[in-house]
Amino acid sequence: MKKTTVINSEISSVIAGMGHMDWLGIGDAGMPVPLGTKKIDLALTKNLPSFIDVLKNVLTELEVQKIYLADEIKTKNPEQLQAIKQLMPNVEIEFVPHSELKKDLAKTHAFIRTGEMTAFSNIILESGVVF
């Protein structure tokens, strides 16, 4: 049995297959996922699992060098922005319009849908290297 913290087989497989500068998306229950993008749906009910819990779990296995967030998170969900910054204090953040973030999901290896029900709780993680 796997010893590390990501025990979801689909998430683990996606992370294992990622290389430097590849993208992985995580988001709220309402984020539209482009056709052709792999969707890993973890949503069970409202706010379960939460966006931040899923992000914490993924960060135990994925080296992240940069993140992409919607500009709108600054004013519409500053609490979530603070939580993200606390998890990754030294990671570069690029803010883009929410409409662009939605389109960029087509470039991700997968999108992990959570049960999160707060606006703009969406992120694209850009993988780094561990050496």
Curated annotation (Swiss-Prot):
Annotated EC: 5.4.99.62
GO molecular function terms listed in the Swiss-Prot or TrEMBL record: D-ribose pyranase activity; intramolecular lyase activity; monosaccharide binding
Binding-site residues, substrate: 28, 98, 120-122
GO cellular component terms given for this protein: cytosol
Pathway involvement of the protein, from the record: Carbohydrate metabolism; D-ribose degradation; D-ribose 5-phosphate from beta-D-ribopyranose: step 1/2
Active site (catalytic residues): 20
Predominant place of localization: cytoplasm
Biological process (GO), any one: D-ribose catabolic process
Family in the record: Belongs to the RbsD / FucU family. RbsD subfamily.
Name of the protein this chain belongs to: D-ribose pyranase
Source organism of this protein record: Oenococcus oeni (strain ATCC BAA-331 / PSU-1)
Lineage: Bacteria, Bacillati, Bacillota, Bacilli, Lactobacillales
